[in-house]
Amino acid sequence: RDGGHPDPEAVHLINEAERLAYADRDMYIADPDFIPLPGKGVATMLDPTYLKQRAALIKPNTSLGKAQPGDLGEVPLGSYTGTEHGTSHITVADKYGNVASMTTTVESAFGSFHMVDGFILNNQLTDFSAEPRDETGAPLANRVSPGKRPRSSMAPTLVMQPGANGEPDALTAALGSPGGSVIIQFVVKTLVGMLDWK
């Protein structure tokens, strides 16, 4: 904290951590019904030893530039990042304490350009990687397959205070964001600003 102002060193560390996280996301994460996460799944990707190795790549005065994905074993998948637009986020609360945090998208502006009964149909399938393989010829985790869901960056978030028994108790914040593939970064930076740089 710096009197409520972002600390440049903290901003740098968050940016570099996000570069590393996105490199792994682009390499390994897709519809889990089609592409399993490497190793033991989430436990492998969040293994403390692995995360320490990734964190050691962050230098205090130098940017990683384009981060490379970590080595999580034999997973013959490549990476691709495309642009996304056409997203909105709303958060609503009522007098009874019910809260909803919802991100909605038609993907690109005007979605698929088709309207049914006043609703614009989305073109969410463009969240799949445009190419089925990366530059080396490795198949992409987020490639198109029949019945498969495209990867999404939407991150509607509820922040709760823990209760006495560890269960969620009082609501601290409800948020989300538009922004395509950088929604996750916007949500992280908003949370850090709210919770750490009050």
Where are the language model's segments positioned?
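Glycine-anchored helix-breaking recognition loops at helix->coil/strand junctions
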Residues: 143-146, 175-179
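Stable alpha-helical elements in mature extracytoplasmic
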Residues: 10-17, 171, 183, 187
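Active-site rim segments in enzyme catalytic domains, especially the processed small/beta chain
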Residues: 93, 98-170, 184, 189
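Alpha-helical support elements that line or immediately flank enzyme active sites
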Residues: 1, 176-197
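Sec/Tat-exported extracytoplasmic proteins
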Residues: 18, 22-25, 125, 191-195
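Acidic/polar loop patches that form or flank catalytic/metal-binding clefts of enzymes
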Residues: 29-31, 127-134, 173, 198
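Internal maturation/activation junctions in enzymes
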Residues: 2-105, 116
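Intrinsically disordered, low-complexity coil segments
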Residues: 3-5, 34-43, 135-137, 161-171
